[in-house]
Amino acid sequence: MLSITPKSKTLNILDKIIFSCLILYSLTFLLDIKINFLTTAFVFGIIKLIFIRPQVRINSKIFYLILLFILCTFLSIVFNDVSSFSLNNISTFKSRFISPLLGIFIIFIYSFNKYNINKLFIGFAFSFFINALAVIYQFFNGDIISYGTRLTGFNNSYMLLCAVNLLILPILFVLAIHKSNISYKLRLLYLITIFVNIPAIIFENTRIVYLGIGIVFPLIILFSIKNKYKAIIFIILFSLYSYACFQISPTSTQRFSNITTTNKNDFSNYQRILMWESSLKMFIDHPIFGIGVGNWHEQYTTNYTPPIKTGDFYHPHNVLLNMLSETGILGGISYLLLFLYLYYISIYNYLKKQDIFSLAYISSLLAYTINCLTDSMFCGHNIKSPTTLFWLFTGFYLILNKYVIISYNKKDLNK
């Protein structure tokens, strides 16, 4: 049995502070507040390294692929033939690609396990539950007239809400309905959270979320419920519930019906096509290193302006085209390799073990990939938190499947 020393006592206090910050982060990540509790937790983790160094064993190639991805994106800043090397491009690169990695590196400075990770998802579920109630209240209060077609609850960015909906709700849904040793009360909490969020998602009027949830949730049901008759009944009930919610909101019904519209009748879709065409031209003109990270907006508004004026956009609302246009074939391939590897290890583990963690991660990864078709990952500054969350959940998955094993020397604890 370990004796309690001043050092072990200090480490215990630091661990409690770190976990408290993580809980606060899960409860506040949707709010526009000055304090980022995930960053605060990371800072205390760095302080913890002063007292003890973890023993790290990595059983995955993921960090090599992350390094390759970061290197290839950085090369676009140095070697692109559009702009010279500048601090502004470095700042954009840091905000979009470096800072969010805090989410995955925090696993090296705190001992995560399935119990404390589950506690964090209770916090995420509570945040989604409260925000969904706020969205529903806004809808029935008629706030859609004041705020336009996008309702966001306590959040102030529909892009952020869109991304986290597709990142986190699939995980909560898997935890709710997949047979596991999670307690009945917790599964009920997650299921109620999903139940309340369905109308909220519909009233938020973000079509890629309709598409992502509409594809991923039925798949989750089919893979989680072994009795296929029950699974089909569940899917039918889910569809009827969603249909009923759409009938309450004519605006949402119209938004849904325009998902596949590609002409000028739906300018939101049409301008995306124009941006995609411009991005493809950028890639064709600058195939190796692209136009450089942070240069898309300037090139789009000066050299690749579409025939019809669109909004003042800073990315093309498609991650692959964004990577190809800004970082060329090197960045595009490194991005694809990274995500293909994540799909490979998670699908391989699920087929091998049928475990709930792999199914939850695959579901989140698939939904987020769908989001990346018309929205953007690797956004910087005020909307970089979805990328941080993506890396955080990837870190959780690596820990839970022992791709990363963190341990501490007992002698160091007793010094």
Model-derived regions: residue spans:
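A membrane-periplasm/extracellular boundary helix in multi-pass inner-membrane enzymes
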Residues: 224-264, 277-285, 293
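Long extracytoplasmic/lumenal interhelical loops at the membrane interface
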Residues: 144-145, 263-277, 285, 289-327
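Transmembrane signal-anchor hairpin modules in multi-pass inner-membrane enzymes, especially those
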Residues: 1-88, 102, 109-122, 175-188, ...
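Hydrophobic transmembrane alpha-helices and their immediate junctions
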Residues: 54, 63, 222, 229-231, ...
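Transmembrane alpha-helices of multi-pass inner-membrane enzymes
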Residues: 19, 42-47, 170, 361-415
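Aromatic-anchored transmembrane helix interface
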Residues: 62-68, 86-110, 128, 132, ...
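Alpha-helical transmembrane segments of multi-pass inner-membrane proteins
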Residues: 23, 102, 115-146, 156-225, ...
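Loop-to-helix entry and N-terminal half of a specific, functionally important transmembrane alpha helix
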Residues: 17-25, 64, 189, 193, ...
